[in-house]
Regions:
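Single conserved hydrophobic/aromatic residue that forms the stacking wall/gate
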Residues: 1-12
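N-terminal hydrophobic/helix-forming segments and targeting peptides
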Residues: 10-469
Length: 469
């Protein structure tokens, strides 16, 4: 059994706890049903922050306003990452309490020149994003989400496949009757990356006249798809070149289990940590130390690029806030980062009785036992991990126990079985105390993942307690 401050199911034994657990789960389920891309998460995050009285840091700078304890600001990076600050009583130089999560999830990205017709069928070519089992993405309804940037400077939002009456798309699979060779392949090769092409149409464009020459018949189905896209979104085929379109599982997240104790949906990794991180910050009164929530992109492919955690965005925004507070210098910025505490809010693998052989039971995460702390992640001898200091873990234990938060500690499977990484090491490189902390997930990186509602609620409580450290 993993170590925990309360036993399995105790979350529900306290008075009125089930209602609180289920009410917050309903809020979260709506969030992940609406927000299936990093851009959509940022857009909804801005709405939540504005409603809570947060100002855009860009506007504060433009107006040459000063910031003080009690002020609340946010900043957006290229519409794909966001950071928010709840300025506390002590100087930022003395350190911040930071909640950091990622809002990108494994998916299929549409290529820049994707559309083609083959034997009367029109397909979109894709390039998968992040670590996926490719065979899981066939024969399942998919939706298209994203943006198309036009040459005139405008950006068109695209969502196809989410409304109950809307159409969906998908990737075909080979029928079992003809699959003898396919069934002999290793799982990694059963469906290959270049075979993940999405079927989007089969009806030719209706011709204005009765012309019958071959030129009119060529790519008639593709022409029909382009005509429909032009009619609804005003986009041409060449506009795919400057588009960011993502194929994701269609439809809303759902309650899971006969007792409704779980949620199944796309993108729990890592929006199940991102949402309570943001809500914990919004719920907080003025803290002693400045509270921060940063939600970033590109974690699933190494946290690279301008919107990933490895960019200078976070440091730059801390510098801007310190400047508005009248306390900026390069040395003070470095001190602020080194004196900070961070929870790298990312998911952990939930123990699964169907695959018990890959888990070491004493150090596994379990549904219903609260938020998960991973002192270290990595693989094959902790390679690539952030290993949190014992002293920092000791402080967090007291904070969680004082706030009556159910928590557990875990590793990602047995030694040498596998492993994984998060954004933790990137912030730790700035010399701050960082630990991975999040929620146990089954089916991680599958189109539909599963989490426990009790763990979600305890994690919200844990994040709220952390911000008051």
């Amino acid at each position: 059994d993993s170590s925990t401050s309360r036993g399995l199911g105790d979350v529900y034994k306290r008075q009125d706890m089930k209602k609180k657990v289920f009410d917050f789960a309903d809020e979260y389920r709506r969030f992940i049903s609406l927000c299936k891309t990093e851009r959509e998460c940022v857009e909804e995050g801005v709405r939540i922050l504005k409603a809570a009285g947060y100002k855009d840091l860009k506007d504060v700078i433009a107006a040459d306003e000063k910031l003080k304890a009690g002020d609340k600001v946010y900043a957006v990076n290229m519409n794909k990452a966001i950071v928010a600050f709840n300025i506390g009583e002590t100087s930022i130089e003395s350190g911040m309490n930071i909640l950091g999560a990622h809002i990108d999830s494994p998916r299929l990205d549409i290529k820049q020149n994707p559309l083609y017709e083959e034997t009367g069928l029109v397909l979109l070519d894709t390039h998968y994003y992040g670590g996926i089992k490719k065979y899981q993405w066939v024969a399942t309804p998919l939706a298209l989400h994203g943006v198309v940037a036009l040459k005139d400077g405008t950006t068109v939002k695209v969502v196809i496949g989410e409304d109950i009456d809307d159409t969906v798309v998908g990737i075909s699979d080979l029928l079992i009757h003809l699959a003898s060779e396919q069934m002999d392949k290793k799982a990694a090769k059963v469906v290959e990356g270049e075979a993940l092409d999405i079927l989007v149409g089969s009806m030719p464009l209706k011709q204005e006249s009765a012309k019958s020459d071959k030129e009119d018949c060529k790519d008639a189905v593709k022409k029909n798809i382009l005509a429909l896209l032009k009619e609804k979104y005003g986009i041409e085929e060449e506009d795919f070149m400057s588009a960011e379109l993502e194929a994701v599982p269609a439809g809303p997240a759902r309650d899971y289990g006969i007792d409704r104790s779980m949620i199944i949906g796309y993108g729990h990794d890592d929006r199940v940590c991102a949402y309570p991180s943001l809500i914990a910050l919004v719920n907080a009164d003025m803290p002693k130390r400045t509270g921060v929530c940063i939600l970033v992109d590109k974690e699933e492919i190494g946290s690279v690029g301008a919107t990933g955690m490895q960019s200078r965005f976070f440091e730059n925004m801390v510098a801007e806030v310190m400047d508005r507070c009248g306390e900026y210098s390069e040395l003070k910025l470095r001190r602020a980062l080194a004196n900070s505490y961070m929870l790298s809010s990312d998911v952990s693998a939930a123990y699964d009785p169907n695959y018990a052989s890959v888990f070491e039971k004493k150090n596994a995460a379990y549904f219903g036992k609260g938020m998960v702390f991973n002192k270290y992640t990595g693989a094959r001898g902790k390679s690539g991990s952030n290993d949190a200091s014992a002293e920092f873990v000791g402080k967090l234990r007291k904070v969680m126990d004082d706030a009556d938060v159910a928590f557990q500690t875990a590793e990602l499977g047995k030694v040498d079985i596998g492993g994984g990484g998060t954004i933790a090491y990137i912030l730790a490189n700035l010399d701050m105390n960082v630990i991975d902390s999040g929620i146990a997930v089954q089916n991680m990186h599958a189109p539909y993942e599963v989490i426990s509602k009790a763990d979600l609620y305890e994690t919200l409580k844990g994040y709220e307690a952390f911000l008051q450290m």
